[in-house]
Design a protein with these regions (language model features):
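Intrinsic disorder at enzyme termini
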Residues: 1-34
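Internal helix-loop-helix
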Residues: 11, 74-134, 138-143, 187-190
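Buried hydrophobic positions in well-ordered alpha/beta secondary-structure cores of metabolic enzymes
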Residues: 35, 46, 76, 83, ...
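Short secondary-structure junction/hinge motifs that connect adjacent elements
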Residues: 53-73
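Mature N-terminal segment immediately following signal peptide/propeptide cleavage
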Residues: 29-51
Length: 190
């Protein structure tokens, strides 16, 4: 039995204001064999696919980063927390953090991976309606589609509360028009 299966996940900084018992504490010794195998797969992926090709990545070779994300998708590294019903692995937050650790030393790939799996996919997973989840999550989980994210605006910087850009439904009701300007879109280069 997985020792973490019966534990309740603590959200964000909740540990600061909630009584937490010692047995609720998670440590690396609590990882399952499956989680350890996933971590090893990350290390091998980095060693075989990324580290020997750092120059290609750093020189922004066209298609290289997207190709790495494709391979990560084939390995399941883009779908760790995505529910199984949408083509994901449906694994725990702890597992996703283990994956992040495993690819953390891969330079800009770790940023592209984090933008895809975190700020690009999680908002749909957490807040999307059923139709949005069914449309986007399977293709994001497989790597067929790449997620990107943009917060920064010329007059607001990265202050989300000062942003002015909006998506406004057109008069025909067929699509949205973006009003305003965004800058520095993570993962937009591919």
């Amino acid at each position: 039995m997985n020792p973490t299966a019966s534990r309740e996940a603590i959200r964000g900084g909740e540990f600061l204001i909630r009584k937490t018992l010692p047995e609720d504490t998670f440590s690396p010794e609590d990882f399952s064999e499956e989680q350890e195998m996933m971590l090893q797969a990350c290390y091998e992926f980095a060693e075989q696919e990324i580290h020997p090709n750092v120059e290609r990545m750093d020189s922004l070779e066209e298609g290289f980063m997207a190709g790495l994300l494709d391979k990560a998708g084939e390995m399941g590294l883009l779908s760790v927390t995505v529910p199984e019903e949408y083509g994901g692995l449906g694994m725990s937050f702890n597992t996703s953090m283990l994956i992040a650790e495993g690819i953390g030393g891969t330079g800009s790939f770790s940023t592209a991976h984090g933008a895809h799996t975190g700020i690009g996919t999680l908002p749909i997973q957490y807040y999307g309606n059923a139709e949005q989840k069914a449309k986007y999550l399977p293709k994001l989980a497989s790597g067929e589609w790449k997620a990107c994210y943009c917060l920064t605006e010329p007059d607001a910087g990265s202050d989300a509360n000062s942003g002015k850009t909006k998506a406004v439904l057109n008069e025909a009701g067929t699509h949205y028009l973006i009003t305003g300007q965004k800058m520095w879109i993570s993962n937009a280069g591919f």
